[in-house]
Curated annotation (Swiss-Prot):
Domain of life: Bacteria
Enzyme class, spelled out: transferase
UniProt EC number: 2.7.1.50
Positions that bind substrate: 41, 190
BP-aspect Gene Ontology terms: thiamine biosynthetic process; thiamine diphosphate biosynthetic process
Keywords of this entry: ATP-binding, Kinase, Magnesium, Metal-binding, Nucleotide-binding, Thiamine biosynthesis, Transferase
A GO MF label: magnesium ion binding
CDD domains registered for this protein in UniProt: THZ_kinase (cd01170)
Organism, scientific name: Caldanaerobacter subterraneus subsp. tengcongensis (strain DSM 15242 / JCM 11007 / NBRC 100824 / MB4) (Thermoanaerobacter tengcongensis)
Described function: Catalyzes the phosphorylation of the hydroxyl group of 4-methyl-5-beta-hydroxyethylthiazole (THZ).
Name this polypeptide is given: Hydroxyethylthiazole kinase
Length: 267
């Protein structure tokens, strides 16, 4: 499955329209290129409808948001819905401030989101519970996050993916636990945002958004493991360079052989 989707991604080179934050925009563009897709960053409300019509996936990331930008995201999201373009929402910092929480919930209410990807605190907040967050980072993982994510997936009718020590992905029917990854990935800012770009890249070509999201998490985690094993890596700076190289050099064979996942099918 993963081999097929990665090959398809690199053959088709899907266009990924980002409305994302100013902190990580360059990294998101570069990781999209590295995995094999094409990034475009278009924010102007006057052009987002036209741009998203030509895209194969849309990323909505509220990391550095304003009310005006949220309005633009919703405008783009509704157009994506009309044209069958998957919408990937990264509710960065939901739970940290009322603006972020209300904005994320508003997007979910007004746009048919395909995938919600966040940390445990963000996903808990969107489910109506209280997540422990500091700034935009979860400071403590929820013990029952798989149940919380499952319930949110059922409620919203979409895939919910939670990044953490063990990643959790569910569509309300199946739950996958991904154990690929490395602690070094948490030493650089933007890995979560970059993961969202990779999720969008896979979902742009996958027939099923659960499968696309799962393969993206596996690919991202394997790249992190391999980068951390590079003898030239001495800290966050060299790790980041090695990580981009590993994303670029991922092969279908490695993706198939080095995955660490547990899959549960709900009754």
């Amino acid at each position: 499955m993963g081999s097929e989707v990665l090959k398809l991604l690199r053959d088709k080179k899907p266009l990924i329209h980002h409305i994302t934050n100013v902190v990580t925009v360059n990294d998101c563009a570069n990781v999209t290129l590295a995995i094999g897709a094409l990034p475009v960053m278009a924010y102007a409300p006057e052009e987002v409808e036209e741009m998203v019509k030509n895209a194969n996936a849309l990323v909505l990331n509220i990391g550095t948001l304003s009310v005006e930008e949220v309005n633009t995201m919703i405008k783009a999201g509704k157009t994506a819905n009309q044209h069958g373009v998957p919408v990937i929402l990264d509710p960065v910092g939901a739970g940290a401030t009322s603006l972020r929480t209300k904005s994320a919930k508003r997007i979910i209410e007004e746009v048919r989101v395909s995938v919600i990807k966040g940390n445990s605190a963000e996903i808990s907040t969107l489910s109506g519970r209280t997540g422990k967050i500091r700034g935009v980072e979860a400071v403590e993982e929820e013990e029952d996050i798989s149940d919380i994510a499952y319930d949110l997936a059922v409620k919203c009718g979409c895939v919910v993916a939670v990044s953490g020590k063990v990643d959790v992905i569910t569509d309300g029917k199946k739950i996958a636990y991904v154990k690929n990854g490395h602690p070094m990935m948490g030493t650089i800012t933007g890995t979560g945002c970059m993961l969202t770009s990779v999720v969008a890249s896979f979902c742009a070509v996958a027939e099923d958004y659960f499968d696309g999201t799962l393969e993206a998490f596996v690919a991202f985690g394997i790249a992190g493991e391999k980068a951390a094993q590079n003898p030239k890596v001495e800290g966050p700076g060299s790790f980041k360079v090695a990580f981009f190289d590993e994303i670029y050099n991922l092969s279908p064979g490695v993706l198939a052989s080095e995955r660490k996942i547990d899959l549960i099918v709900k009754g």
